[in-house]
């Protein structure tokens, strides 16, 4: 099983090494800081490279064992890449707002998912028997529930691993995962604490290019895991009528060619 490859140059070009202003640092991140330049902390990429590799291995191994990965990133610049990565690797995501109790109170969350399914069915059936006002209200509910729960509606239970962008913003998600003993992979910037993170990726968590790179690598690691899982089950990917995440696998093959 080959992990997705990346180079130090790619990390540099994406700005992974740029931390925050030195006065905004969290001392818990000092072991991963190389130095400072123009009042900005610079992360030590010689540490980020092997740690990112370990994090990707955790993603791949989780999926290879049949586990579920939940991608979490609710801030503006992470929202798109998080959803895209999860969708192309047949995983799950939260990219709108973390709902308290998503993990620790899954029963209630699954009831909301059930409500979303019922609304979807009703709307697909033309919302018969509803007044215009009721229909509008239902459309609003549908949009709200879809934004909050659309990425986890098929998850079917708590995930086996969390992949997080911005530990400060997603502190509640990490706390819930810690409480349930769910391992956490996360990008940790110089202004954050790595506490509660099992697989730390020291890196910039604000730059769009850096976020896209992390998400793309994690998606590819998940796809590697899926290929391994199907291979172990004796499934020939070439014989499947509809290969899982077929488009993503084809893209990967094209990129390697």
From Swiss-Prot:
Lineage, broadest ranks: Bacteria, Pseudomonadati, Pseudomonadota, Alphaproteobacteria, Rhodobacterales
UniProt keyword list: Ribonucleoprotein, Ribosomal protein
Encoding gene per record: rpsB
Gene Ontology biological process: translation
Name of the protein in its database record: Small ribosomal subunit protein uS2
Record family assignment: Belongs to the universal ribosomal protein uS2 family.
Organism (species): Ruegeria pomeroyi (strain ATCC 700808 / DSM 15171 / DSS-3)
InterPro entries in alphabetical order: Ribosomal_uS2, Ribosomal_uS2_bac/mit/plastid, Ribosomal_uS2_CS, Ribosomal_uS2_flav_dom_sf
Matching NCBIfam families: rpsB_bact (TIGR01011)
HAMAP family: Ribosomal_uS2_B (MF_00291_B)
């Amino acid at each position: 099983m080959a992990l997705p490859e990346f180079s130090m140059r790619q990390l540099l070009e994406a700005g992974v090494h740029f931390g925050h202003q030195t006065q905004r640092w969290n001392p818990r991140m000092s072991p991963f800081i190389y130095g400072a330049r123009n009042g900005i902390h610079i992360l030590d990429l010689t540490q980020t490279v092997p740690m990112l590799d370990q994090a990707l291995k955790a993603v791949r191994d989780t999926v290879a064992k049949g586990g579920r990965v939940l991608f979490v990133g609710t801030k503006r610049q992470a929202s798109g890449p998080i959803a895209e990565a999860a969708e192309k690797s047949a995983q799950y995501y939260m990219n709108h707002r973390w709902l308290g109790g998503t993990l620790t109170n899954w029963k209630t969350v699954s009831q909301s998912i059930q409500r979303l399914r019922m609304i979807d069915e009703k709307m697909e059936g033309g919302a018969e028997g509803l007044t215009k006002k009721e229909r509008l209200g239902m459309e609003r509910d549908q949009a709200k529930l879809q934004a909050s729960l659309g990425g986890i509606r098929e998850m079917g239970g708590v995930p086996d691993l969390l992949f997080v962008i911005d530990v400060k913003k997603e502190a509640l998600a990490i706390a819930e995962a810690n409480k349930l003993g769910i391992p956490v992979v996360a990008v940790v910037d110089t202004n954050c604490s790595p506490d509660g993170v099992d697989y730390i990726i020291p890196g910039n968590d604000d730059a769009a290019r850096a976020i896209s790179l992390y998400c793309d690598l994690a998606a590819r690691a998940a796809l590697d895991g899926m290929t391994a899982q199907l291979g172990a089950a004796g499934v020939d990917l070439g014989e499947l009528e509809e290969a899982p995440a077929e488009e993503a696998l084809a893209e990967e093959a094209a990129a390697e060619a």
